[in-house]
Amino acid sequence: MLYWLIDLSSSIPAFNVFRYITFRTGGAVVTGALFVFLCGPWIINNLRLRQGKGQPIRSDGPQSHLVTKKGTPTMGGLMILSGLTVGTVLWANPVNPYVWIVLAVTLGFGFVGFYDDYMKVTKQTHAGISGRTRLLIEFAIAGAACFALVWLGRSSLSSSLVIPFFKEVVLNLGWYFVIFGAFVIVGAGNAVNLTDGLDGLAIVPVMIAAASFGLIAYLAGNAVFADYLQINYVAGTGELAVLCGALLGAGLGFLWFNAPPASIFMGDTGSLALGGMLGSIAVAVKHEIVLAVIGGLFVLEAVSVIVQVASFKLTGKRVFRMAPIHHHFEQKGWTEPQIVIRFWIIAVMLALAGLATLKLR
């Protein structure tokens, strides 16, 4: 909404600053953080009162969790999504379609996660919505978003897969790109969901990825920078940097309450939504493969589960002591802070590697 203050810049020159994406991104960071900082305690208290016993803990998971995490409320993603939405609505260009498409995916996935969390809390079981039902809904949301992105672009680029490290190598998938893009978004959502198993483990890598894709969106949406870096220019996507800024701010606010020992868990409400958001931004700015690098930690967590399940079904043996892989290291004797901080370091290194692909062409 504040973007419209540009109309007053002729009489009040100071309002001209709202033209700049960088300024509005900074404003979104501050707004998202302040909203969660100020409203967080009220949200946590209300969730604790309504949930009673809090999030049910898996009996087949690490036994220490039955003691250290018992009674902690979930659905903390509501805090993040609220701060993200407020920051976006206040600071983003309200007529930019990319903003609304990505926000729709984020909130849509958030609703699926919220209902899943609600089922778990009310039934006091770690099994919420059936996996098949959840995937069908996620693919419907992601497919609709990808269709909108292809239709919005109305060019061969919008339906193409861009290969990093090469200047002009693209694979035009046509309308099959809708299916590919949907897999990227759904995969990202569920990969982040699997990562969210320890206090602070998911939110910091999400913020690192959001900051990285905020920069990528800004560069890809700027014709001059895109030409200099020889990346594909996607008009209008620069505005997604504001959305990434809002997520970064809301994530910082949430981390204040999610730092060990956590006062609240983000739950599927947050993890599905944030993963879906990262996936949809990657699709919008044509950096789907780079997402697998920057979000490599999430890929590792997801692959560990796939390998574990496949190995057990085919051979009856487990590759890891427990999956996702962060539980494997718990079983090996690593402390929770050791796992979390080391995974954060990995996330930073992967983000730098992903950003390096912008120049290595």
Curated annotation (Swiss-Prot):
GO terms for biological process: cell division; cell wall organization; peptidoglycan biosynthetic process; regulation of cell shape. Pathway: Cell wall biogenesis; peptidoglycan biosynthesis. The chain crosses the membrane at residues 25-45, 72-92, 95-115, 133-153, 169-189, 200-220, 240-260, 264-284, 289-309, 338-358. InterPro entries: Glycosyl_transferase_4, PNAcMuramoyl-5peptid_Trfase, PNAcMuramoyl-5peptid_Trfase_CS. Its cofactor is Mg(2+). GO terms for molecular function: metal ion binding; phospho-N-acetylmuramoyl-pentapeptide-transferase activity; UDP-N-acetylmuramoyl-L-alanyl-D-glutamyl-meso-2,6-diaminopimelyl-D-alanyl-D-alanine:undecaprenyl-phosphate transferase activity. Its EC number is 2.7.8.13. It catalyses: UDP-N-acetyl-alpha-D-muramoyl-L-alanyl-gamma-D-glutamyl-meso-2,6-diaminopimeloyl-D-alanyl-D-alanine + di-trans,octa-cis-undecaprenyl phosphate = di-trans,octa-cis-undecaprenyl diphospho-N-acetyl-alpha-D-muramoyl-L-alanyl-D-glutamyl-meso-2,6-diaminopimeloyl-D-alanyl-D-alanine + UMP. It is found in: Cell inner membrane. Keywords: Cell cycle, Cell division, Cell inner membrane, Cell membrane, Cell shape, Cell wall biogenesis/degradation, Magnesium, Membrane, Metal-binding, Peptidoglycan synthesis, Transferase, Transmembrane, Transmembrane helix. Belongs to the glycosyltransferase 4 family. MraY subfamily. HAMAP family: MraY. This is Phospho-N-acetylmuramoyl-pentapeptide-transferase. It comes from Rhodopseudomonas palustris (strain BisB5). The gene is mraY.
